[in-house]
Amino acid sequence: MRKRKRRVMIAPYVPQIALYRQWLKDTRGLSFESYDAMWRWSVTDLDAYWKSIWDYFLIPSPKPPGSVLGRRDMPNAAWFPGAQVNYAKQVFRHVEAASKAGLPAVVSRNEKGAHRELSWRELKRQSASLALHLKAQGVKPGDRVAAYLPNIIEAMISFFATASIGGVWSLCAPDMGTAAVLDRFRQIEPKVLIACDGVSYAGKDYDRTQVVQELRAALPSVRHVILHDNLGGTGGVADAVRFADTTARDDAGTAAFEPEWMPFDHPLWIVYSSGTTGLPKPIVHGHGGILLMSLALNVIHNDVGCSYAPNSYGERYHWYSSTGWVMWNCQTNGLLNGTTCCIYDGNPGGVRDKPDWGTLWRFGAETGVTFFGAGAAFFANCMKADVELATCGDLSRIRALGTTGSPLSEETQRWGTQQFARLANSSGNPAQKDIWWCNMSGGTDFAGAFVGGNRELPQIPGEIQCRLLGCAVEAFDEQGRSVVNEVGELVCTEPLPSMPLYFWRDEDKRRYLSSYFDTYPANFDGSGRGPAWRHGDWLKITPNGGCIIYGRSDATINRHGLRMGTSELYSAVEALPEVVDSMVVDLEYLGRESYMPLFVVLREGINLDEALKAKINGAIRSALSPRFVPNGVFQVAEIPRTLSGKKQELPIKKLLLGQPIEKVINKDAMANPDCLGWYVSFAHARLGSGRKAS
C-alpha cells in the first residue's frame, strides 16, 4: 500500500461545540455561562434550538421552513411542516469541495485485507446509476427496498440510491438466518431485494445464495433482485441482476442526476426493534428528523469535523458495526458533514482459531482514522486480551474514542487512557495525552443518543459526560418524579425530530404508544405533565450533570452491543422437539464480561447432555446469529411465569445480578412460585456467598 503523508491535527484545534456556541453568539446574540445553561435553553426553547441546527448546517431545501414545530405533543409532533429535504442531497453537497481537496468519501477493508477507496464523485455517480435503475424497475417514493448486505461500500451506495428517489430503505445483516430476516421483511413488503452471495467472518466464508433464494420465495412483493458478488460468485440466484451492472452507468443521465425533494417527514428507512414481545417492530424514521439529529450528534457532540475544513482537515471517522446494528446507519451519517468514513467488514477479534483483538486497531492505523468508535464490549475485550496499542501500527492520528452499545466500565476506560498516554510520547499528538472518550447511549428507536460526549467537559471514568442538546432527558423514580444522584428510568419529556414517524402498518399508533408511552402517559402524575418517552434504561444523573447508564430495564438481549429480542431466540430453541419451554437472560451490565444463560425445560425422560447442548446452540446459530449463542445451557423443571403466562425474564435477571428475591418478584402474581428456589440457588452459586440472593 502506498504510504500517505500524515497530517496530525494539533493545537489549536477548536472543538466543534465551541464553534457552534460562537456561531450562536454571533448570529443569535446568545451567550451561556455553562454547558448546563446551554442544555436548558435547548430543551426549553425547542423551536430556537432546532432551527439553529437547520441554519448552522445549511440544510439544502427549495422551500425553507416557515415554522419548526407545527405540533408539539408526543408522539404526534410535526416538525418543519411544509419543508422539503433529502438525506442524499446533504451528502452530495460535499462532492465538489471534498473532491477538490483530494479526499475520499469511503475507505473500506475486509478481513481478507481487500482495500478499497471510493471518491466522492464515484459515490454520487454509482448512487445515481443505481437510483436510475431502481426507477426503471418501477420504484416510486414510499416503495421499500430491502437489503441483505454486509458492511461494505455497496450497502452505502444502495442506501443513497434508494433515498435519492424517495424509496424506503431497510437492511438486515447476512449473519442473520432466513427466519429472522423474514420476520422483518415480510412486514414491510419490499419491492426490490438487494443481496449478496455470501460473507466472510472470523476466517470462514459463508455462502448465502440459498438464503437469498428462500427470501425471494417467501416475499411475494419482491419484483426485482439485485445480487452483489461479495465472495466472487459462489452461486447464482435465478433472474437476479448483477450489482456491478446496476452501478456501471456513466453518461449524461447520471451526470445530471440529483436526488428528489421529499417532505421533511417522508420515510427514509425502516429499522427494527429487538422483538422482545413478538415480531420485531418496524420503526420508520424520516429524512428531515434523521438529518438534524445526526448532524447535531456527530458534529457537535461527537466532535467529528468536515474532512476538507481547515479546523478538521483530513478527519477520518470509523465506527465498527455490522449491518444488523443501528450504528451502521450512524456510521454512514458521517458523510452528511463531508467526513471521510472508514468501514471494516469482518470480525474485529480475528479468526476463530487465532483470536487477534489488534485487528481493528491496525485497520485504524493503516487508514489514518482520527475518530475510532466501537461497542464498549470491543474495548473490554481488547483489555482482557492484553492488547498493546504500541504494537498495532501508527495510531498517531486518533484523537477520540467512541463507545456505545453497553456501559463502558471504569477499568476499561482507564486501560485505554493509559495506552494512549504511552503512545503520546512518540505520536506528537497532544490529544493522546488524555485521550477523549466520547461515550454515549441512545437507541435504534430514534437512531440517536440521549446522553453523550462534550469535548469541553471533564472526563470521569464510568460516566457519560452530559445530556445532549435538545434531549430533555430525566431519571424518573417509581412515582414519576425527576431525581438526581439516584438510579431511575431514563425518560425524555420533550419530542425529538428523529423519534419514529410511526411503526409500519401500525395505523392507529397503538404499538407505538404501548412501546414508549404506556408507563408515563399524558397527565400520568395528575399535574398535567406528559406524556414522557420511557426508553428502557436505568439512568443516574450526577450532581455535576454527568450520566451513568446501568443497563436495560427490560428483557432485551444486548449481546456485545447487538440487540435481539428474546422471542426470536425462543422460536429457534422451542422448535426443537426435545425442548418444552425456555428462558434466556442477558447479564451484560456495567461493563462486566457478557454472560447469557439459557434455561430449558425438556420433555419427560430427556436429560441435557453435551449433544443436546450442541443441538440447541446450533439452532440459535442457524436461525439468529453465532453472536447469540448462550454462555451456558441449564436444564430446569419450570420457567417462572406470571398468572397471565408471561415469562418473568426481568425479575430473574435482577435476581442473577444480586438483588434479593423479595425485592424483584411478587410471588402472589406468579403461576408457579415454587420454582423460584432453583433460581435462587443458581444466583447464589454464581454470585458467591459474598453477594447472597436470598
Enumerate the language-model features and the residues they cover.
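Conserved AMP-binding A3 loop
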Residues: 116-121, 260-262, 268-292
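Conserved AMP-binding/adenylate-forming
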Residues: 133-176, 180-182, 300, 318-322, 399-401, 408-546, 553-556, ...
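AMP-binding/adenylate-forming catalytic core of the ANL superfamily
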Residues: 147, 170-198, 212, 353, ...
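Structural core segment of the AMP-binding/adenylate-forming
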Residues: 164-246, 375-376
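Adenylate-forming
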Residues: 192-211, 344-348, 367-415, 438-445, ...
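Conserved C-terminal "lid"/linker of ANL adenylate-forming enzymes
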Residues: 224, 583-588, 597-599, 617-694
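Conserved AMP-binding/adenylation subdomain of ANL enzymes
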Residues: 289-316, 323-370, 385-386
